[in-house]
């Protein structure tokens, strides 16, 4: 074992003070416990150090086995060429090492109270982070693990995952300050308008470390080339190509994801919003946009900020378009009995077919636990 490999074993087996916050967050390269986002990718200290040494010392590697070696915690030192290639595929950037601009921050600022690069003294973003954290504890899976070996999703797996996400969305919305201020009819209108977009956005961001699949909350994967669920696979392919890949290219961080989700949620053009609540919704969206812009300015080089801000906002139109196709697929699944559609999904995504559309002032959605 080389000195460098001994150092990696040492850093992998000993926890830094920060690493205790990442007990369930995994390295995108080898699957070991991650200690943060390093050089553009979630990684452990071992892979972080390996990538840094490779770039700084300008190492060049050759694989003896056709560049098909498995890279995991146990075998990551077996082939440096394949390991380095995985580092690059997962988003590590040479320039982050060369210019020392890598901002090492927790990938999950919600788990340890860290602001993860948030603009100082921004109470609105702090509120959004707390809202996200309030539902994070309800999740039964960790969204940052790699999932190459995960089970192929069935139709029921897809709808089960959607049910879980919609339940979390309702609980998330209840915590939002702007949501609490509007009337019940507007609350339901916002939830219905955003429900499918929420599914698309969450699936896209959760799958940011995958290249050919959407990772669902119930530990299953929806691969874009699998023939099992052709309609859903087409949606998965669009999510990957039009949302996940751009998120990865932009190195979108969790604060930006949280803010963009809230911008999409508080849409003053959502069908069914009352005239009394319209200005409240519009004002809330404007406030979030301003905080979002300040955050992007804070974390981006000055010359890149306007383009980055625009590109992040340009993720919204494809998410809306994909969400409409997703609603159609759910409608077809219900029509032909292809999957179980629970009451919450029915009320949110197919309100015209639900059982409770007559009483708009006391919506069962808000009573869902």
Swiss-Prot record:
Main location (coarse class): nucleus
| Renumbered zinc finger spans (NR C4-type) | 70-90, 106-130
Query: Where found in the cell?
Result: Nucleus
Q: Which residues form the NR LBD domain?
A: 120-352
**Keywords for the protein's UniProt record, in alphabetical order:** DNA-binding, Metal-binding, Nucleus, Receptor, Transcription, Transcription regulation, Zinc, Zinc-finger
Domain of life of the organism in this record? Answer: Eukaryota
Transmembrane annotation, as ranges: none
Q: Residue ranges of the DNA-binding region?
A: 67-142
A GO biological-process term: regulation of transcription by RNA polymerase II
GO MF terms listed in the record are: nuclear receptor activity; nuclear steroid receptor activity; RNA polymerase II cis-regulatory region sequence-specific DNA binding; zinc ion binding
* Gene Ontology cellular-component terms listed: nucleus
Which interval of the chain is the signal sequence?
none
Q: Does the keyword Flavoprotein apply?
A: no
What does the protein in this record do? Orphan nuclear receptor.
The similarity annotation says: Belongs to the nuclear hormone receptor family.
Q: What is the protein name for this chain? A: Nuclear hormone receptor family member nhr-64
This protein's species is Caenorhabditis elegans
What gene does this protein come from?
Answer: nhr-64
